[in-house]
Regions:
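Conserved C-terminal region and hinge/linker of Rieske [2Fe-2S] proteins, especially
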Residues: 1-232
Length: 232
């Protein structure tokens, strides 16, 4: 009986009534599939709570930055510190949460709705907000923004946040190819390789490279490793 009810709750729109009923179900009393449904239902409730959290963050921080430096990554010292204290976050993390909440609540209503309905996760909503911010700063056409948002939400259903990031970036690149090329050139200037000694005769090499160059390096290392393995 509980398994059937859990499955019904999974399909219902998230909200306080559904959450209360889930709390009153002991997941250990469910069979294997029922436990999975229970977990998924709780995850959907998490999306609903996160949607409320975006509204609450903006209520504390305000809908606009203290200093108008754009739609993203502005610094709001008093509000940021209040949110950092309330949520036990580092100040830089609190500022990021403020930025994301403003973008979601003011520019991405469909994303907020999808989050509240448990259709996407908080991580996916954050990705959509962050990747949309550059276009918002440049004054994206509302129709383009709606297309970007709808595509990202639909893609999120069966993909991870990292995959959603790549998808949204590809859409952004097509919408503003000139700016994308500028950003690619700027990113290439940050390439670097570091060598760090480690204990017990070991060392660590870290590299930030253009993808094509990184692929070449990886293939060379892999080839050398395979050769040494075959010799042994």
């Amino acid at each position: 009986m509980n398994e059937e009810r859990t499955k019904e709750l999974l399909e219902q729109t998230p909200g306080i009534d559904v959450l209360v009923e889930l709390i009153n179900i002991d997941p250990n009393s469910l069979n294997a599939s029922g436990r999975v449904d229970y977990l998924a239902a709780l995850e959907r409730q998490g999306g609903w709570l996160q949607a409320l959290m975006q509204i609450a963050i903006v209520a504390v921080a305000g809908s606009e930055p203290a200093a108008d430096r754009g739609n993203y990554s502005d610094v709001d010292d008093p509000q940021r510190e209040e949110i950092a204290s309330a949520l036990n976050l580092a100040p830089v993390t609190a500022q990021s949460r403020i930025d994301v909440a403003r973008v979601l609540t003011q520019h991405l209503p469909a994303t907020c709705t999808a989050l509240a309905n448990g259709e996407i996760s908080s991580a996916q909503a954050t990705v959509i907000a962050k990747e949309s911010s550059a276009l918002l700063r440049r004054g994206i056409d509302p129709d383009q923004l709606r297309y970007l948002e709808a595509t990202a939400i639909a893609y999120s259903e069966f993909h991870t946040p990292a995959q959603v990031t790549h998808k949204v970036r590809s859409i952004v690149a097509k919408m503003d190819p000139v700016e994308f090329e500028v950003e690619v050139a700027q990113a290439a200037q940050t390439r670097r390789v570091t060598f760090t000694p480690q204990p017990y005769g070991m060392a660590q090499i870290m590299a930030l490279l253009p993808a094509s160059e990184a692929q070449s390096v990886w293939l060379a290392i892999d080839k050398l490793a395979r050769s040494n393995r075959d010799k042994n």
